[in-house]
Amino acid sequence: MATIGMLYICTGKYTVFWPEFYETFSRNFLPGCKKEYFIFTDAPSIAHEDDPAVHRIDQLAYDWPLSTMKRFAIFLTQEKALEQLDYLFFFNANLTCREVITPEEFLPRPQQGEQLLLVQQPGFWNKKPMFYSYDRNPRCTAYI
């Protein structure tokens, strides 16, 4: 059984989304897999924090765009724990999982040579690659 890490930033007004996120993902996302929720929050308490799979981590709320720019630095505060997981996902706070998503249809299948899982943001659907927001500055380390 794979162990899935769920990264979730739950600061400021976004705390309102956490209960439904937890309930729908616990029920529908990768049934049969062990899920560990890493909740970065400034709230004094959150729903479901008594669940041993919910790891509440104190986190200062940042205004946008700083919250996005510092996201990976925030996650790396838990690097040791995250290294123990088989798969790691970050989800936007307002996402819900309305239908069952099985490991067979979602996770890579190593026996078939699959090693990575990629998800495309809906904003890129039906766009020509020249309109993707990739960094095209050859001096940038994020250059594509």
Regions found by a protein language model. Give the residues of each.
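Glycine-rich, basic loop-to-helix element that forms the pyrophosphate-binding segment
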Residues: S67-F75
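Conserved donor-nucleotide/metal-binding helix-loop-beta segment in metal-dependent transferases, i.e.
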Residues: T96-N137
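N-terminal anchoring/stem segment of glycosyltransferases
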Residues: M1-S67, K80-Q84
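Short His-Asn-centered micro-motif
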Residues: Y8-C10, I39-D42, F91-A93, E99, ...
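Short beta-strand-to-loop acidic/aromatic patch adjacent to the donor-nucleotide binding site
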Residues: Q84-N94
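Generic beta-sheet signal
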Residues: I4, D86-L88, L117
